[in-house]
């Protein structure tokens, strides 16, 4: 187990062989078209989530869900009919250096130009909410991301 940082956070970091970027991008449009790409496009259209000239921030935690969302938006920008800008942001709330490095490596491998900024949230949480850090940590991270996206 690797410590994420702070006193209450631990995660298991899987270290697996990465697939080639071209294979990953092709699988989004081909292999996972029905289960992922089509549903993503349907939601974008049904809820008018992307309109001409929009600037969209995709927050990346480093997990598979946010990395997939980033790739979906890249593919939409590349193949879509609407002109929009997309920016990929990631917050470093005080990650263990290995965790931050893994985030950077994964984004580089996936050709996701992520902008990482520091927030020191884990330090604040360790001082203010040692016994039950998760609720306050989640609220603070969300607030920081909303402000950064503006």
Language model regions located:
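ATP-dependent adenylation/nucleotidyltransferase module used to activate substrates
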Residues: 3-150
